[in-house]
């Protein structure tokens, strides 16, 4: 039983990472002035530069989600109802954004219609924990 549980966990992790690597920002979408319904809600928070990747999930009605986490010309894209940034990409992004803000933009799909939610910022402290 433990072996099956371990195999399932590894498969889910692999699929999640693959989803982040193949993500694309939708080409056609409407804009919403509302922040995305995510859990945990990281909007407006400050994080240390050496924190592990922040994962979150969309809690509203949607069949898919694309998350764009960016600072200047560096970005991470994840797809799926749960955003799970790649650890190496996350570390690189935080080091570049140290002392500045990340911009997070969430796109959700419902009934084949994409919506771009109001982007939010996450401040990156230059201090480590």
How would you describe each model-predicted region?
Residues 16-19:
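C-terminal motif of bacterial Sec signal peptides marking the signal peptidase cleavage site
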Residues 21-23:
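Bacterial signal peptide processing site
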Residues 25-36:
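Proline/serine/threonine-rich low-complexity linkers at boundaries of modular beta-sandwich domains
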Residues 38, 117-129:
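Low-complexity, Pro/Ser/Thr- and charge-rich linker/hinge segments at domain boundaries
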Residues 39-62:
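Contiguous beta-strand segments within globular domains
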Residues 59-71:
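Solvent-exposed loop/turn segments flanking beta-strands in beta-repeat/beta-sandwich domains
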Residues 81-99:
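Signal that preferentially marks extracellular ectodomain short beta-strand elements
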Residues 96-110:
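Short, aromatic- and glycine-rich surface loops/edge beta-strands on solvent-exposed regions
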